[in-house]
Swiss-Prot record:
One of its GO terms (molecular function) is S-adenosylmethionine:tRNA ribosyltransferase-isomerase activity. GO terms for cellular component: cytoplasm. It holds the Pfam family Queuosine_synth. PANTHER family: S-ADENOSYLMETHIONINE:TRNA RIBOSYLTRANSFERASE-ISOMERASE (PTHR30307:SF0). Belongs to the QueA family. Transfers and isomerizes the ribose moiety from AdoMet to the 7-aminomethyl group of 7-deazaguanine (preQ1-tRNA) to give epoxyqueuosine (oQ-tRNA). Keywords: Cytoplasm, Queuosine biosynthesis, S-adenosyl-L-methionine, Transferase. The keyword Cell division does not apply. This is S-adenosylmethionine:tRNA ribosyltransferase-isomerase. It comes from the Bacteria. It is an enzyme of class 2 (transferase).
C-alpha cells in the first residue's frame, strides 16, 4: 500500500488546540470493525462498552517537561527537545539552532543560564548532552523545562498543560509526548469501570518525539519505525492469560498500549514461547496485513493523515472502515489529535 492511501483532508479548525473543560466531556465515535457500523456518543459511553471480565490496559508513562530553551556559550539561541533520558546526567535530544553544535560545545539552558551541558556526541539527527550539575536530568527538567506540546498545537505551553497533557494514572517519567487516549479518563470513570467488574493492567511505553515525524517513503513497506522503550511486566502477562482463559477481552487504551502488548506477543512468537515479560526497545510497525495477537478492542484518538497510527488503526478495524470513520468524523466536526476526541473500536475478525 502507498502512504497516500491514508490521506484525508482535515480542516484546520478541527485540530484541537485545548482540551475540553472536563476529561470525559470529549466525544466518542464507536465502531464495529466487522460491520463498519458507527455510533456517535460521548466518552462516558466507554462505561457501556467495557464489560465485566474485560482487561483494560493503560500506558502509565509520565510526560516529562522535555523542552528547554537556551543558548550556546558563544551566544546563539537554541531549543532542546529531549528524546530520551540516558541516565541521571545525560540525555539524547533534538537540538534546534542556526548552526548545529559540535562535540565539545557547551550550552546554557534556562531563562538565566541556570544550567550548563556539554555536547558529547552526535547520533544521526540526535545529540548526546551531559549536564554539569549535582541535580539529575529529571530534577532540572521539572524545574525549568516546558511541556512538549505537539507541533500541531500551535501555541506556547501553559500552566494548565502540566496537568491536562498528562494522564491521571501516570507513574513512570520518560515520555516526551502523551499517550493521548488516556487523557479522557478521570478518577471517577476509572472507579465506575472497576465497579462494573473489569480489571486494569499497566504497561509502559515512553513515547518519543519520533511519533510526530512524517512517513518519508511512498510505499509503507519501506518505512522503518523509530525505537521506543517498552515494559510489559509479569503481572500484565498473568492478567492477559487469565482474561483470555475466562473469555474476556483485552481493551487497549491507546496505540502505545497496543504497540507494547503486540511487541511482547511478537517477541514470544519469534522465540517460540508462551507470552513472557518484555523489557526493551520496540520498532514494531503495525499496518494492514498485520495479525493482532492480543488486543480485542482499542480506544484511540483521531490521528494525522498518512501517519503510522492511522495505519495501525486500519490494521485493527479494516482499511475501508477506518477511512470511512475518519470521513464521518470530519463531516460531523469531531476534534482531532492529542487534545481531541476519540474512538472505541471492536477488532475486525472476519
Amino acid at each position: 500500500m502507498q502512504v497516500s492511501d491514508f490521506h484525508f483532508d482535515l480542516p484546520d479548525e478541527l485540530i484541537a488546540r485545548y482540551p475540553q473543560p472536563e476529561r470525559t466531556a470529549s466525544r466518542l465515535l464507536q465502531m464495529d470493525g466487522n460491520t463498519g457500523e458507527l455510533i456517535d456518543g460521548t466518552f462516558s459511553d466507554v462505561l457501556e462498552q467495557v464489560q465485566a471480565g474485560d482487561l483494560v490496559v493503560f500506558n502509565n508513562t509520565r510526560v516529562i517537561p522535555a523542552r528547554l530553551f537556551g543558548r550556546k556559550e558563544s551566544g546563539g539561541k537554541l531549543e532542546v527537545l529531549v528524546e530520551r533520558m540516558l541516565n541521571e546526567k545525560s540525555i539524547l535530544a533534538h537540538v534546534r539552532c542556526s548552526k548545529s553544535p559540535k562535540p565539545g560545545t557547551t550550552i546554557l539552558v534556562g531563562e538565566n543560564d541556570e544550567y550548563s551541558a556539554q555536547m558529547v556526541a552526535r547520533h544521526d539527527a540526535l545529540f548526546e548532552l551531559k549536564f554539569n550539575s549535582d541535580k539529575t536530568v529529571l530534577e532540572i527538567l521539572e524545574e525549568i523545562g516546558h511541556m512538549p506540546l505537539p507541533p500541531y498545537i500551535d501555541r506556547p505551553d501553559e500552566d494548565a498543560d502540566k496537568e491536562r497533557y498528562q494522564t491521571v494514572y501516570n507513574q513512570k517519567p520518560g515520555a516526551v509526548a502523551a499517550p493521548t487516549a488516556g487523557l479522557h479518563f478521570d478518577d471517577v470513570l476509572l472507579e465506575k469501570i472497576t465497579a462494573k467488574g473489569a480489571e486494569f493492567a499497566y504497561v509502559t511505553l515512553h513515547v518519543g518525539a519520533g511519533t510526530f515525524q512524517p512517513v518519508k517513503v511512498d510505499d509503507i513497506d519501506d518505512h522503518h519505525m523509530h525505537a521506543e522503550y517498552v515494559e510489559v511486566p509479569q503481572d500484565v502477562v498473568d492478567a492477559i492469560n487469565a482474561t483470555k482463559a475466562r473469555g474476556g477481552r483485552v481493551v487497549a487504551v491507546g496505540t502505545t498500549s497496543v504497540r507494547s502488548l503486540e511487541s511482547a506477543a511478537q517477541d514470544a512468537l519469534k522465540k517460540g514461547t508462551e507470552l513472557v515479560p518484555f523489557f526493551g526497545d520496540t520498532e514494531i510497525f503495525i499496518y494492514p496485513g498485520y495479525e493482532y495477537q492480543l488486543v480485542d478492542c482499542l480506544i484511540t484518538n483521531f490521528h494525522l493523515p498518512e501517519s503510522t497510527l492511522i495505519m495501525l488503526v486500519s490494521a485493527f478495524a479494516g482499511y475501508e472502515n477506518t477511512m470511512n470513520a475518519y470521513k464521518h468524523a470530519v463531516e460531523n466536526k469531531y476534534r482531532f489529535f492529542s487534545y481531541g476526541d476519540s474512538m472505541f473500536i471492536k477488532k475486525k475478525t472476519a
